[in-house]
């Protein structure tokens, strides 16, 4: 176990270094931040002073070396727009995005899992055709279009839910979240559902495939021969066997929910990482964009490691070292 973790940490360090080089190189090819920071009518001396203050007058390799040495000590630079450390802004906005992604994942599991099991147990029924057709639709609908339609229907026409924002934040056991207040719940329902739609479709398809595969196995036939009820078979024999691959996939997909919440957060003005990054891209705020991308890469690396360990714990047939005992 320790050897595996150590090896994965070393691999992660290499991946982070390569990604930092790629991200820093690509972001330096996109526009000049000074154009966004100064008045177009400013004198050349003023423009040069701003460029010098932010270290943009130095060669790219010098800028990258300073960034790399700073990153090793947790300093990813200061935001050009906010004048604050980029990493502190990321950490400050992360709880809102984490809350949104977690709520979206819960919605995806609560809706997708039972529908997928039903579709797997009734492969030729009309209900299954409707469910699977809807899952294809859920994968195909653009997130931004669905978000706008939800706002028009549930906020503008019906007036049931607020258009934007995070709402009132409550506290429970020292954890602050908008889901602990009624106003916060009303604010999170639409953006979380919008973010969860694609994952609902994915969970349905994963669960259906797993259910159909497991129901053909001998131990299920034996359970039926013993006279066990369908509900008991599903609860004690089907679920434990289909949850392992679903959990491992969803752990990685949780990272994608955080990484790709950008569109949803922009539509619903959710004060998380996505909105911060969109504003940073518009203003060519390089430190924020670089810090965000490296933060997401680190998150994915951690999730991958955790998934591998969980998978080995849940399934004794799996060995982290790649060998069987």
What residues fall within each predicted segment?
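Cytoplasmic-entry segments and transmembrane alpha-helices of multi-pass inner-membrane transporters
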Residues: 1-7, 11, 114-150, 244-246
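Alpha-helical transmembrane segments of integral membrane proteins
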Residues: 2-3, 94-127, 156, 173-325
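Helix-terminus/capping and membrane-interface signal
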Residues: 12-22, 100, 300
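Hydrophobic alpha-helical transmembrane segments of membrane transport/permease proteins
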Residues: 15-65, 158-180
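Membrane-water interface segments at the C-terminal ends of transmembrane alpha-helices
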Residues: 22-29, 58, 67-69, 134-165, ...
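Short hydrophobic, aromatic-rich alpha-helical segments embedded in or entering the lipid bilayer
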Residues: 42-75, 220, 268-280
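Membrane-interfacial helix-loop-helix junctions in multi-pass membrane proteins
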Residues: 52-60, 77-86, 168-188, 281-287
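An internal, D/E-rich "acidic patch" concept
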Residues: 57-113
